[in-house]
């Protein structure tokens, strides 16, 4: 117990019952899963994703641990670097038709069946999660249909042609295009990234997939070096009411999914640095500020919320893939462990479940 901690239990015993916590860092997903199968951890939820569930479920009895599959608040989503230092890429990534093409080029049903075992829901990214009642359900399915024909037509319109006959499209300026898909398994499952990369290659967009550490990913993302951002995003209404980050460049903090870094510079410097964002970005900033100061449940509040979602969804700065459950792991010797309602950072993971009252029985 910690004598300086501010909570005691109902009998007056000082909390927490467990006086020390050690965290083992295992970046490689296979190593991480092996450690869990061998019961080398007492609790784990962060970085666990549904594609790893079968091996964890299969070894529960042998490892004397329990897996609960709980719904996620966030969802896998992808962004393009609309302020890329490569001006040829910046022009293409900033073209809404390109982002529309990349959205409909994804076979979300197949991704759900293969990577999520049919347990997820193909869905567009709305920023809000779960979807509030004042937001039209139609936005959840906006541009998520699998339509490679439409993707090819849009890419043709932009002027992205295969000029050298290698099966992949060049940029409109004639330069070769390779989209570097760096990802961390803390943010998105490798199977999802590989399948999305394959889908894009099928409409002539060459990709290179590489797994990196979370630190490498975040550093590259915040220094405007990524071609593509890939992480999990989404917040409940209650959080959005006090936190505007999903609607203001760069659309999340250092540890989340950021895009439009030079737009953020422009906004933060009042236009003295960075790149001026499009009008819809400024509109979103104005709307979230008014939304947060408007009476909850009023007609104006709901009008603003719907408009924010429409603006977010139709501009596809973050493109949703699939939302599904994820594993929560605990060793059976860890007692007072109640089943989580959600798998989420947004509710501070263990905080609602009184982790201070967990104890060991062994």
Language model: regions and residue ranges:
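Detector for C-terminal structural segments
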Residues: 1, 68-76, 81, 103-138, ...
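Loop/turn elements at helix/coil->beta-strand transitions in domains of secreted/extracellular proteins
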Residues: 19, 40-42, 62-65, 95-99, ...
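Extracellular/periplasmic solute-recognition and catalytic clefts
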Residues: 24-86, 109-114, 228, 232-234, ...
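Short, hydrophobic alpha-helical packing/hinge segments within bilobed ligand-binding/sensory domains
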Residues: 32-33, 98-99, 217-221
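A short alpha-helix/helix-coil micro-patch that ends at or immediately precedes a cysteine
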Residues: 37, 196-203
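Short, well-structured beta-strand/strand-turn elements
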Residues: 44-46, 161-165, 201-216
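Primarily short, surface-exposed interaction patches in extracytoplasmic proteins
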Residues: 45, 89-94
């Amino acid at each position: 117990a910690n004598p300086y901690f501010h909570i005691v239990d109902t009998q007056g015993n000082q909390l927490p019952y467990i006086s020390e916590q050690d965290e083992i860092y295992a970046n490689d997903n296979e190593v991480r899963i092996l450690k869990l199968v061998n019961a080398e951890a007492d609790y784990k939820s962060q970085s666990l994703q549904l594609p790893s569930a079968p091996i964890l479920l299969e070894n529960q009895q042998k490892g004397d641990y329990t897996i609960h599959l709980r719904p996620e608040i966030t969802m896998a989503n992808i962004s393009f670097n609309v302020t890329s230092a490569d001006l040829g890429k910046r022009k293409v990534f900033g073209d809404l038709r390109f982002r529309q093409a990349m959205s409909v080029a994804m076979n979300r049903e197949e991704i759900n069946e293969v990577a999520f075992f049919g347990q997820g829901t193909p869905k567009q990214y709305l920023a809000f999660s779960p979807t509030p009642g004042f937001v039209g359900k139609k936005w959840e399915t906006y541009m998520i249909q699998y339509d490679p024909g439409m993707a090819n037509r849009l890419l043709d319109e932009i002027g992205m042609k295969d000029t050298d006959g290698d099966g992949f499209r060049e940029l409109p300026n004639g330069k070769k295009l390779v989209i570097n898909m760096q990802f961390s398994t803390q943010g998105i499952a490798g199977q999802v990234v590989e399948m999305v990369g394959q889908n894009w290659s099928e409409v002539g967009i060459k990709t290179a997939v590489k797994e990196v550490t979370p630190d490498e990913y975040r550093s590259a993302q915040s220094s405007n070096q990524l071609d593509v951002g890939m992480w999990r995003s989404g917040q409940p209404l209650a959080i959005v009411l006090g936190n505007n980050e999903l609607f203001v460049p760069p659309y999340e903090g250092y540890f989340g999914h950021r895009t439009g870094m030079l737009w953020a510079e422009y906004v933060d410097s009042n236009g003295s640095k960075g790149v001026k964002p499009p009008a819809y970005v400024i509109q979103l900033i104005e709307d979230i500020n008014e939304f947060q100061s408007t009476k909850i449940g009023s007609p104006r509040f709901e009008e603003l919320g719907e408009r924010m979602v429409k603006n977010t969804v139709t501009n596809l700065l973050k493109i949703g893939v699939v939302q599904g459950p994820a594993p929560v792991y605990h060793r059976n010797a860890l007692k007072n462990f109640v089943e989580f309602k959600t798998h989420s950072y947004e509710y501070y993971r263990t905080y609602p479940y009184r982790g201070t009252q967990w104890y060991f029985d062994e």
